[in-house]
Amino acid sequence: MKVLVITALCFILLQNVLGEDTYEDLQNYIENLINENQDEARECVPLENDCTKLKYSNPCCKDEKKKYQYKCSCIVDKTEQCTCQRKETVEKMMKGMKYIKNLGKKIG
């Protein structure tokens, strides 16, 4: 979720550079990502807090009920404490980051 918030803040800076239509498309894309992930927040105890060791591997969390598959999601700062989220959530965030990176290449 931190990544989405930081990304959203970056869009404010991009607004002046981008045309209105492009900015609105980008804003809608991020809002859709956030809305899709709202119901996925769950308490999860990391097995380790070393994200450089885990490298988004499964399993990074204890899930007694074996209900979900998890991935480490320290994608902003490798030294940040490891948080674990559902695999689907992490993959959606990575897809969003890739979209933004490609958009940056088109602009620059």
Swiss-Prot record:
GO CC annotations, alphabetized: extracellular region
Residues with PTM Isoleucine amide: I107
Signal peptide coordinates: 1-19
Modification(s) after translation: Contains 4 disulfide bonds. Cleavage of the propeptide depends on the processing quadruplet motif (XXXR, with at least one of X being E).
Disulfide bond sites: C44-C61, C51-C72, C60-C84, C74-C82
Tissue expr: Expressed by the venom gland.
Propeptide part(s) removed at maturation, as residue ranges: 20-42
The UniProt record lists the keyword Signal: yes
Localization of this protein: Secreted
Keyword Ribonucleoprotein appears in the UniProt entry: no
The entry's keywords: Amidation, Disulfide bond, Knottin, Secreted, Signal, Toxin
Any one GO molecular function term: toxin activity
Annotated motif Processing quadruplet motif, positions: 39-42
Free-text note on domains in this protein's UniProt record: The presence of a 'disulfide through disulfide knot' structurally defines this protein as a knottin.
Family: Belongs to the neurotoxin 19 (CSTX) family. 11 (latartoxin) subfamily.
Function per UniProt: Insect toxin.
This protein's name: Latartoxin-2c
Organism from which the protein derives: Lachesana tarabaevi
